[in-house]
Amino acid sequence: MTSVVADSLTETKTDSQKPIATRKDGRIDLLGLSREDIRAALKSKGLDEKQAKLRTKQLWHWMYNRGAVAFDGMTDIAKTMRPWLAEHFAISRPEVVTMQISTDGTRKWLLKTDDGYDYEMVFIPDADRGTLCISSQIGCTLNCRFCNTGTMRLVRNLTVGEIVGQIMLARDSLDEWPSKPEGRLLTNVVMMGMGEPLYNFDNVRDALKLVMDGDGIALSRRRITLSTSGVVPMMARAGEEIGVNLAVSLHAVTKVVRDEIVPINKKYGIDELLAACAAYPGVNNARRITFEYVMLKDKNDSEEDAHELVRLLQYYRLPAKVNLIPFNPWPNSPYECSTPERIARFSEIVFNAGISAPVRRTRGQDIMAACGQLKSAAERQSKRDSMITLS
């Protein structure tokens, strides 16, 4: 990751525990930094400890409670101080390449990083909630065969600022500043966009802690869901250090099929994965694990598959909800969606066993924003980079 970002960022040495990245223009981007790092950055530019502590508190409030992107409107900071802050610091947002709105109201943004790579995020409005699906990586290493993102190679991890920036940008678009505890349009965040969050653990953890901070965005951990394809060694740590809701991309109940469509199963099998789910901190009947199950015609959608799913969940005594996801096609995809009748029968079998098994309503399909469809121009850039390297 650092080798990719190094072309656009340098590092500023501070008394913080870690170096702080500096932009091409020499300024330090405050978005995504912890309070400790902001204070250290201010001190590195000449402020004493007392002033740095005060300014950190003020900046935090303006960034995460009011959505400020400039210093000149920060009315509780002295006018003489504001130009100095603007000279040395920035409060960024992701660059928007395109924004599309589906006929059903779903919005998809194509975003660009400072070093020129693309990634995507999606906002899904409903009557009682608004869910933002955000990315953790540019590309992915997991190669899930039904997932469009899985056909890309991994370019790099997103930084803390790039992860948090997606939420900030969405709230800009929804006019949700200043932050308010009730009546929000953006009520939920799911880490189900591009990438495997547990393969970018530190940045995802730090970003979500910032999002949950009570003095800023203040989104409850009950409103945040982290999705994994089954990086078993990191799951317990995620529960302990992040503590948000867990979703697992299961998608099959036999080794043969899951090995094919979710190749990480060859490393961490179904039984090992479900045992890790059972041990996830805080799991109980009031806080269930969500299992994602994409419905693929004649692949994983038989009545036998449904009964085996029930058996597995009951064997591991998992408080569970199963989201049945009609497969969303993408160009040259190797699978077809199960028939509505077969999906309904699958749901019925699971539901009759006492396990919630709703069929997810497809959203944003007309703009390639539905589950499994995200795939940005980052892949094309990767191919161009490879061609340059080869030449």
From Swiss-Prot:
Gene3D superfamilies documented for this protein: 1.10.150.530, Aldolase class I
Binding site for S-adenosyl-L-methionine: 195-196, 227, 249-251, 328
Record's miscellaneous remark: Reaction proceeds by a ping-pong mechanism involving intermediate methylation of a conserved cysteine residue.
Molecular function as annotated in GO: 4 iron, 4 sulfur cluster binding; metal ion binding; rRNA (adenine(2503)-C2-)-methyltransferase activity; rRNA binding; tRNA (adenine(37)-C2)-methyltransferase activity; tRNA binding
Name of one Pfam family that matches: Radical_SAM
EC class name: transferase
Chain sites annotated for binding [4Fe-4S] cluster: 140, 144, 147
GO biological process terms, semicolon-separated: rRNA base methylation; tRNA methylation
Record EC number: 2.1.1.192
GO CC annotation: cytoplasm
Protein name stated in the entry: Dual-specificity RNA methyltransferase RlmN
Gene name linked to the record: rlmN
Biased composition (Basic and acidic residues): 10-20
Active site: residue positions: 120, 371
Domain Radical SAM core stretches: 126-366
Keywords: 4Fe-4S, Cytoplasm, Disulfide bond, Iron, Iron-sulfur, Metal-binding, Methyltransferase, rRNA processing, S-adenosyl-L-methionine, Transferase, tRNA processing
Positions of region (Disordered): 1-20
Record's catalysed reaction(s): adenosine(2503) in 23S rRNA + 2 reduced [2Fe-2S]-[ferredoxin] + 2 S-adenosyl-L-methionine = 2-methyladenosine(2503) in 23S rRNA + 5'-deoxyadenosine + L-methionine + 2 oxidized [2Fe-2S]-[ferredoxin] + S-adenosyl-L-homocysteine; adenosine(37) in tRNA + 2 reduced [2Fe-2S]-[ferredoxin] + 2 S-adenosyl-L-methionine = 2-methyladenosine(37) in tRNA + 5'-deoxyadenosine + L-methionine + 2 oxidized [2Fe-2S]-[ferredoxin] + S-adenosyl-L-homocysteine
Cofactor binding, per record: Binds 1 [4Fe-4S] cluster. The cluster is coordinated with 3 cysteines and an exchangeable S-adenosyl-L-methionine.
General function of this protein: Specifically methylates position 2 of adenine 2503 in 23S rRNA and position 2 of adenine 37 in tRNAs. m2A2503 modification seems to play a crucial role in the proofreading step occurring at the peptidyl transferase center and thus would serve to optimize ribosomal fidelity.
Cofactor dependence: [4Fe-4S] cluster
Main localization, broad class: cytoplasm
Localization terms from the record: Cytoplasm
